[in-house]
């Protein structure tokens, strides 16, 4: 017999609204990822209701798609919890920038902001970064919206414009970010980013360069693969050189000397040229960050028309999983002392390798259903699985897709892997959760079960 509490949670609490009349499915670049997310969708909120987040109220509308599961993570701020592995990575990066880059007064060049609240406006998250109104990254299926005007930030880049407008020329931003995504050991709806920005005046950039006084930052030219239309080639190449030098020093500090690095050209809406850095770690090339020369239009709009700059962004979980051999992103949210005590280090730069907790067995259950006639999107299903199954769910794989030759209806079959990080799950316990997932999918997504 299915657990009634789970069914109730699935039906009443998957979306913050108590009553959901139907699924409003829309179709789907994320900051510092050059790979666009899959096209996905969201479910309507209840107009007239209000969300309370971090002491502020936000009216809901047809764009509201927050889940209780995600809302419970707001304010946890793992990157600020002392001795948490994400805190260790943040502190190592901060220490490196503080020690390596100083002004004449011997104070740090870069200021650090790691307590900025995650609720931002859609203008901050998209428009300030020159992301077009019709860009797929704005879709409800990829983001968590409080309403049409507010959302949980999808990247720390959402704070770039405000900090530049405040007159800052060099800063790091660290924070939790939120995205609707697939379910596996490397993806979670909440993760943590570190953003870096540096602006240069003409004097700062060309200081020490032969005949630097005759060089200019800007020109009226044309855009090419190597530069923006407003930048001189000399300025761009110096900014690019500084950016790559700064980031190579950073990853060498984190991973050790002798690290092999390569740069891959890519695209971001707010930088050009843009690059991804890959490192050769244990014989495998790993993407660790995205970066580029900031779009001058963004810099100008923030009031720094006489400067040129670079920006980069990296994921803390990505680095921590590699540096500390942490195999599953869910572990970062664990409160198990066996996990946390492994990172109680006297020196933040001390090498540590995560010792796995006992590997409890996985339980596999499949779920098959016919899709509704139109507008089915996978991220709605993933949100249901995450909310009902919570961190019992290790991953979800689409293992079969079938189109009926006569009716042309499409069927999906997903394999859900259940595994608790701290104990063995019983078949009965998993069965209850799985049935609740099935019922919620039927009620909220309009699918027809093949259970």
Swiss-Prot record:
Its EC number is 6.1.1.20. One of its GO terms (molecular function) is ATP binding. The keyword Iron does not apply. GO terms for cellular component: mitochondrial matrix; mitochondrion. It catalyses: tRNA(Phe) + L-phenylalanine + ATP = L-phenylalanyl-tRNA(Phe) + AMP + diphosphate + H(+). It comes from the Eukaryota. It is found in: Mitochondrion matrix; Mitochondrion. GO terms for biological process: phenylalanyl-tRNA aminoacylation; tRNA processing. The keyword Aminoacyl-tRNA synthetase applies. Substrate binds at residues 157-160, 179, 186-188, 193-195, 287, 312. Its main location: mitochondrion. Residues 358-450 form the FDX-ACB domain. Belongs to the class-II aminoacyl-tRNA synthetase family. Is responsible for the charging of tRNA(Phe) with phenylalanine in mitochondrial translation. To a lesser extent, also catalyzes direct attachment of m-Tyr (an oxidized version of Phe) to tRNA(Phe), thereby opening the way for delivery of the misacylated tRNA to the ribosome and incorporation of ROS-damaged amino acid into proteins. Monomer. This is Phenylalanine--tRNA ligase, mitochondrial. It comes from Mus musculus. The gene is Fars2.
């Amino acid at each position: 017999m299915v657990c009634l509490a789970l069914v109730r949670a699935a039906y009443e609490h998957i979306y913050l609204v108590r009553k959901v009349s139907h699924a409003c499915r829309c179709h789907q670049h994320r900051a510092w990822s050059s790979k666009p997310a899959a096209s996905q969708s969201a479910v309507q909120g209840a107009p007239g209701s209000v969300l309370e987040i971090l002491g502020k109220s936000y009216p809901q509308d047809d764009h509201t798609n927050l889940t209780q599961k995600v809302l419970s993570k707001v304010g946890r701020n793992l990157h600020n919890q002392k001795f948490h592995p994400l805190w260790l990575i943040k502190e190592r990066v901060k220490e490196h920038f503080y020690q390596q880059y100083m002004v004449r007064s011997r104070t740090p060049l870069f200021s650090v902001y790691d307590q900025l609240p995650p609720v931002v406006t859609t203008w901050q998250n998209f428009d300030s970064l020159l992301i077009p109104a019709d860009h797929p990254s704005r879709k409800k299926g990829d983001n968590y919206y409080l309403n049409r005007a507010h959302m949980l930030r999808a990247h720390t880049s959402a704070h770039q414009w405000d900090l530049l407008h405040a007159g800052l020329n060099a800063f790091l931003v660290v924070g939790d970010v939120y995205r609707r995504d697939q379910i596996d050991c490397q993806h979670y709806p909440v993760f943590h980013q570190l953003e870096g920005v540096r602006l240069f005046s003409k004097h700062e950039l060309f200081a020490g360069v032969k005949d630097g006084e005759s060089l200019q930052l800007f020109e009226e030219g044309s855009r090419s693969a190597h530069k923006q239309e407003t930048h001189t080639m000399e300025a761009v190449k110096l900014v690019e050189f500084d950016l790559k030098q700064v980031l190579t020093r950073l990853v060498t500090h984190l991973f050790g000397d002798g690290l092999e690095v390569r740069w891959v050209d890519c695209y971001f809406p707010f930088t050009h040229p843009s690059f991804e850095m890959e490192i050769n770690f244990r014989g495998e090339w790993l993407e660790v960050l995205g970066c580029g020369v900031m779009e001058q239009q963004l810099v100008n709009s923030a009031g720094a028309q006489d400067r040129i700059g670079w920006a980069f962004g990296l994921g803390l979980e990505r680095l921590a999983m590699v540096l500390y051999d942490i195999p599953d992103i869910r572990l970062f949210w664990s409160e198990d002392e066996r996990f946390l005590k492994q990172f109680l280090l006297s020196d933040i730069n001390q090498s540590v390798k995560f010792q796995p907790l006992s590997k409890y067995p996985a339980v596999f259950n499949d779920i098959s259903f016919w899709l509704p006639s139109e507008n089915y999107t996978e991220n709605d299903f993933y949100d249901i699985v995450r909310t009902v199954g919570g961190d019992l769910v290790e991953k979800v794989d689409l293992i079969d897709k079938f189109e009926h030759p006569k009716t042309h209806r499409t069927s999906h079959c997903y394999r859900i892997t259940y595994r608790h990080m701290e104990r063995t799950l019983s078949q009965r316990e998993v069965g209850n959760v799985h049935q609740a997932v099935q019922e919620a999918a039927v009620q909220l997504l309009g699918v027809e079960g093949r259970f």
